[in-house]
Regions:
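Conserved N-terminal phosphate-binding loop of PLP-dependent enzymes in the Aspartate aminotransferase
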Residues: 1-145
Length: 145
């Protein structure tokens, strides 16, 4: 699915809402228990919900209380994602290439491993391509490398 939006934060917020709804209605996660796994060093926007799972204290400071329901793992480590998955995991939300503090490219096998893990555990995989998509890496989307 592709979500065309006016802003990256709006797209990420919609993806969060959609994945939570899917978890409650389809995966049968108990109400208000859905979790989304995110990677450290992320930048998905500056809304109140999005800064709740930011690892940048400058983005989070003085804006609490923060929105619950997010689990942070090490970027580029598929094994940390698999360890974090539980019955309440709705989705994994990651950037194929992180771009907030320079260009951080994960190991070549990272995204294929994450895809397999998500499929194995019935978890949605959300890729935020706002900074890396639409030909910026030489392919239409960065996940295609």
């Amino acid at each position: 699915m592709c979500l065309p939006m006016n802003a990256g934060a709006e797209a990420v917020e919609t993806a969060i809402k959609s994945s939570r709804r899917w978890a409650y209605r389809t995966k049968k996660v108990q109400p208000n228990k859905a979790e989304i796994i995110v990677a450290d060093g992320n930048f998905h926007g500056r809304t109140t919900t999005i800064i709740s799972f930011s690892s940048d204290e400058n983005s989070r400071g003085d804006f609490g209380p923060h929105t619950p329901g997010f689990v942070t793992v090490k970027y580029g480590c598929a094994e940390s994602i698999e360890k974090a998955i539980n019955k309440n995991t709705a989705a994994v939300l990651i950037e194929p290439i992180q771009g907030e503090a320079g260009i951080v490219v994960p190991p070549k096998d990272y995204l294929p491993k994450v895809r397999k893990i998500c499929t194995k555990h019935n978890v949605l995989m959300i890729l935020d391509e706002i900074q890396s998509g639409l030909g910026r890496t030489g392919k239409l989307f960065a996940y295609q490398h």
